Design a protein with these regions (language model features):
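Cytosolic catalytic domains that perform sulfur/thiol-centered chemistry
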Residues: 1-76, 80-207
Length: 207
């Protein structure tokens, strides 16, 4: 996983509540455990008029320029609710999404974002509306910047919002560590504990 420190990019607005993981990537789009190609199924029910022909729906924001190159999503409450499928986060990442800004997230989806290099930014609805207004004045030029070290999101010269993120999640993203990487980092601590525990409770280790 790549370290996440700062990112600047185009933001697409999907201001709806309760966008669930089945909307993000329908189950029929999940044909393997591979991440490759999942971006083609991202928001498939909304992006295509026909799932068979893959004819695009012109009105859907990610089918429009410059939003085809969006790396931020501005959205509503409870984004990523529903089933726990990690493919939803994989599809977003494969598309190029690096940060999602919402008032709240599905709890498992939020954790999956952290584990896969997407920054979930918790921000109040009114602040998201102001970001949306800024972006839509000139979406190709009016890009957003998120600085994870400072936990701030920046829009132009006048808008700068702080957001909260648990220190452990922040450090894992900054260092590019998923759950396995975090565990490998503390192997010496684990081995020291096992050695001490073996000495104090030898019966636990009988075979």
């Amino acid at each position: 996983m790549e370290p996440f420190e700062q990112h600047t990019g185009i933001a697409a607005s999907l201001i709806q509540i309760n966008i669930d993981t089945d909307a993000i990537i329908p189950s029929r789009e999940i044909k393997s455990v591979s991440k490759k190609g999942l971006e083609n199924g991202l928001f498939a029910e909304w992006r295509y008029t026909s799932l068979n022909t893959r004819k695009e729906t012109p009105a859907f924001i990610l089918n429009q320029e410059p939003y085809r190159r969006a790396s931020f999503i501005l959205t509503g409450e409870n984004f990523g609710c529903g089933s726990s499928r990690e493919h939803a986060v994989w599809a977003l990442y494969q598309w190029g999404i690096r940060a999602i800004v919402a008032p709240s997230f599905g709890s498992i989806f939020y954790s999956n974002c952290i584990q896969n290099g997407i920054l979930p930014v918790l921000l109040e609805t009114e602040k998201i509306r102001k970001l949306k207004t800024f972006v839509e004045l000139n979406p190709a030029i009016n890009q957003l910047t998120v600085d994870l070290k400072d936990a701030t999101i920046i829009a132009g010269n006048d808008i700068r919002y702080s957001f909260e993120i648990e220190p452990n999640n922040q450090q894992n993203l900054l260092q590019g560590l998923d759950a396995i990487g975090s565990t490998l980092k503390i192997i010496p601590t684990i081995e020291a504990f096992e050695k001490n525990d073996h000495r104090n409770r030898p019966w636990v280790y009988f075979k």
